[in-house]
């Protein structure tokens, strides 16, 4: 009987990490994990305060808009965030900027007020089935050219772009 209990505990302990990784980081959140109507932390209905401390290394100014909101969670505490899967603006695709047309042809559907923001590439809602909440299916990261090719068309095989669909969780026509 003692061996059965030990075996049961071991199976449970070994399965917990697998279960935790089966879901995306936002999957355990309800709408109120990010959105707050009566207790909003800023002018928008979000439960988190926009990050006013993180500095865009390319412009040397604080991030604004939706990117500042994303960085409220996804930046290190010393840079004004909550430290949840922090992104590095030095080792990430540039964000919080107006795209350079000499480097990329960015579709209007991924721009916010003419800028490349976090939500241009990511849709963080749990209904998004894509790898890393990207707005384009990359088959779990194995076909990143589908994603990069949205804007950097000269860097990919054009035939790989013919079936690209940009995910939008707010599209209720599905």
Mark where each language-model region is.
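N-terminal signal peptide c-region/cleavage motif recognized by signal peptidases
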Residues: 15-19
């Amino acid at each position: 009987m003692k061996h059965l209990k030990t075996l049961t505990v071991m199976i449970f302990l070994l399965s917990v990490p697998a279960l935790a990784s089966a879901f995306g980081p936002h999957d355990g959140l309800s709408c109120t994990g990010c959105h707050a109507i009566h207790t909003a932390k800023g002018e928008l209905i979000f439960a988190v305060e926009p990050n006013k401390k993180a500095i865009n290394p390319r412009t040397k100014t604080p991030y604004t808009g939706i990117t500042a909101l994303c960085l409220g969670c996804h930046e290190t505490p010393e840079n004004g965030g909550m430290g949840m899967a922090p992104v590095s603006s030095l080792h990430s695709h540039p964000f919080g900027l107006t795209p350079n047309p000499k480097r990329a042809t960015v579709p209007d559907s991924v721009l916010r007020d003419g800028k490349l923001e976090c939500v241009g590439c990511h849709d963080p809602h749990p209904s998004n089935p894509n790898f890393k909440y990207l707005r384009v299916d990359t088959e779990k990261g194995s076909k990143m050219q589908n994603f990069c090719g949205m804007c950097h068309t000269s860097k990919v095989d054009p035939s790989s772009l013919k079936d690209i669909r940009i995910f939008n969780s707010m599209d209720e026509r599905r």
